[in-house]
């Protein structure tokens, strides 16, 4: 239902990636209108956001050698994530290998796929790897990536320490709400796009989230601000 309604609402694209003023009218059954109001107010659980955080953590775990592939897979997008080579055929490494395949395939972050990716994250055991317990060389590798992508992977206005950020990813609290009129809950984004980040530069041959959003949603911030419902 959501997908069809939003396709109709977004049929007229406005070529302006920053701020747009829109007036939308919806008609439908009471249950449909109630769902649209929940979307407009942000009262929707953003499963894609959890899948994104888990994906970033798995990406870093592979880059730092905490997790290794169990098959001969070469990541053309980011060779560093498989640089540690093949590892033991353990449940954790098998889960990582399956997750990496989904990253390479650019899986859509719809509800079903987000739940599947969450199961792989749980099986990988990454959430149990607290910062204080990581080897020094692993922490150094993670810190290098974090420093380069801080603005994309956490609050751009914040000054969160890498250790606090990593442990927050381990805690993996699922947000109860999202931004008003969050289009990413309606027209799903992709795992590789979100790991690559708004400014890109992490994965070779993958668009930045900025370019993906402006092409797919018509704006670079696909959510609502200052809504009157």
Language model features with spans:
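Long, contiguous binding/interaction regions
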Residues: 14-229
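Short, Lys/Arg-enriched N-terminal segments with co-localized hydrophobic residues
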Residues: 1-15
């Amino acid at each position: 239902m959501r997908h069809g309604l939003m396709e109709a609402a977004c049929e007229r694209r406005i070529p302006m990636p920053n701020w747009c003023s829109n007036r939308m009218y919806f008609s439908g059954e009471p249950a449909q209108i109630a769902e649209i109001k929940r979307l407009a107010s942000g009262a929707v659980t953003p499963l894609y956001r959890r899948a994104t955080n888990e994906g970033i953590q798995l990406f870093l775990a592979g880059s730092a050698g905490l997790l290794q592939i169990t098959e001969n897979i070469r990541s053309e997008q980011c060779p560093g994530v498989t640089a540690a080579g093949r590892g033991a055929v353990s449940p954790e490494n098998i889960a990582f290998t399956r997750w990496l395949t989904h990253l390479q395939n650019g899986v859509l972050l719809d509800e079903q796929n987000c739940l599947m990716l969450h199961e792989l994250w749980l099986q990988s055991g990454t959430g149990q790897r607290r910062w204080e317990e990581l080897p020094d060389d692993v922490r150094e590798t993670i810190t290098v990536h974090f420093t380069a992508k801080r603005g994309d992977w956490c609050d751009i206005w914040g000054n969160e320490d890498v250790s606090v950020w990593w442990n927050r990813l381990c805690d993996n609290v699922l947000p109860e709400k999202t931004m008003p009129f969050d289009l990413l809950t309606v027209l799903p984004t992709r795992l590789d796009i979100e790991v690559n980040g708004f400014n890109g530069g992490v994965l070779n041959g993958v668009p930045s989230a900025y370019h993906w959003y402006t092409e797919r949603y018509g704006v670079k911030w696909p959510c609502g601000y200052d809504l009157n419902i």
